[in-house]
From Swiss-Prot:
<keyword id="KW-0964">Secreted</keyword>
<keyword id="KW-0528">Neurotoxin</keyword>
<dbReference type="GO" id="GO:0090729">
    <property type="term" value="F:toxin activity"/>
</dbReference>
<feature type="disulfide bond">
    <location>
        <begin position="20"/>
        <end position="34"/>
    </location>
</feature>
<keyword id="KW-0108">Calcium channel impairing toxin</keyword>
<keyword id="KW-1015">Disulfide bond</keyword>
<comment type="similarity">
    <text>Belongs to the venom Ptu1-like knottin family.</text>
</comment>
<keyword id="KW-0800">Toxin</keyword>
<keyword id="KW-0872">Ion channel impairing toxin</keyword>
<keyword id="KW-0732">Signal</keyword>
<dbReference type="GO" id="GO:0005576">
    <property type="term" value="C:extracellular region"/>
</dbReference>
<dbReference type="GO" id="GO:0005246">
    <property type="term" value="F:calcium channel regulator activity"/>
</dbReference>
<keyword id="KW-1218">Voltage-gated calcium channel impairing toxin</keyword>
<protein>
    <recommendedName>
        <fullName>U-reduvitoxin-Pr5a</fullName>
    </recommendedName>
</protein>
<feature type="disulfide bond">
    <location>
        <begin position="33"/>
        <end position="44"/>
    </location>
</feature>
<feature type="disulfide bond">
    <location>
        <begin position="27"/>
        <end position="39"/>
    </location>
</feature>
<comment type="function">
    <text>Binds reversibly and blocks P/Q-type voltage-gated calcium channels (Cav).</text>
</comment>
Length: 48
């Protein structure tokens, strides 16, 4: 569980640096994924 929190923190800091979450990274809710990706099933996946 602690590892997950650290991981979430890293992703959150990535998002604040890039302004979006890189593809294939974990995301929550309607987080903004980079490029043509959307947050699906907890990950940034290509928009189908």
């Amino acid at each position: 569980m602690r590892l997950f929190l650290i991981f979430t923190f890293i992703v959150a800091s990535l998002a604040s640096v890039y302004g979006c979450i890189p593809a294939a990274n974990p995301c929550r809710g309607n987080a903004k994924c980079c490029g043509n990706y959307v947050c699906k099933n907890g990950r940034c996946l290509p928009r189908s």
